Curated annotation (Swiss-Prot):
Protein name (Swiss-Prot/TrEMBL): 6,7-dimethyl-8-ribityllumazine synthase
PANTHER family named among the record's database cross-references: 6,7-DIMETHYL-8-RIBITYLLUMAZINE SYNTHASE, 6,7-DIMETHYL-8-RIBITYLLUMAZINE SYNTHASE DMRL SYNTHASE LUMAZINE SYNTHASE
Pfam family, one: DMRL_synthase
Active site residues of this protein: H90 (proton donor)
Metabolic or biological pathway, per its Swiss-Prot or TrEMBL entry: Cofactor biosynthesis; riboflavin biosynthesis; riboflavin from 2-hydroxy-3-oxobutyl phosphate and 5-amino-6-(D-ribitylamino)uracil: step 1/2
Binding of 5-amino-6-(D-ribitylamino)uracil, residues: F24, A58, F59, E60, V82, I83, I84, F115
Residues that, per the record, bind (2S)-2-hydroxy-3-oxobutyl phosphate: S87, T88, R129
Length: 156
């Protein structure tokens, strides 16, 4: 008996991507978008198959992602944004609700949805994760989306 392994490949050719990005902390969010686009193109995807959708903030990411995912225009959704802790409990509420909501959209739509939303203690950590010391989490989220689309295809 031989164990069967099923894995997604890392080729983006022909995949239609929706990138949903929150505008709050946009100077960092834009770096995440650039990282995601770079990843898709490096893995054989076309800029013609990438749509960037901007929403006001992280709290709106789940509903906008759901609407876009249900449109039938996309094979994968990549959520991007930046939530930085402040001096009030607002961070905890927004981070938790955005995370839960985005996960729920993936389960409801059965379209691969990846989470590239930074949740950091401070601005420096966010900048580090948007293309400096800690890589680019937009790139990482796009890579996950590519793999998941191909995995879903194999699973039927």
């Amino acid at each position: 008996m031989q164990v069967q392994n099923i894995e997604g490949t890392l080729t983006a050719q022909g995949i239609r991507f929706g990138l949903v990005v929150s505008r709050f902390n946009d100077f960092i969010g834009q770096k995440l978008v650039e990282g995601a686009i770079d990843c898709i193109v490096r893995h054989g995807g076309s800029a013609d198959n990438i749509t960037v959708i901007r929403c006001p903030g992280a709290f709106e990411l789940p509903s906008v992602t759901r609407k876009a995912a249900m449109s039938g225009k996309f094979d994968a959704m990549i959520t991007l944004g930046v939530i930085i802790r402040g001096s009030t409990p607002h961070f905890d509420v927004i981070a938790a609700e955005a995370t839960k909501g985005i996960a729920q959209v993936g389960l409801e739509t059965m379209i691969p949805i990846t989470f590239g939303v930074l949740t950091t203690e401070n601005l420096e950590q966010a900048i580090e994760r948007a293309g400096t010391k800690a890589g680019n989490k937009g790139f990482d989220a796009a890579l996950g989306a590519i793999e998941m689309v191909n995995l879903y295809k194999q699973l039927g």
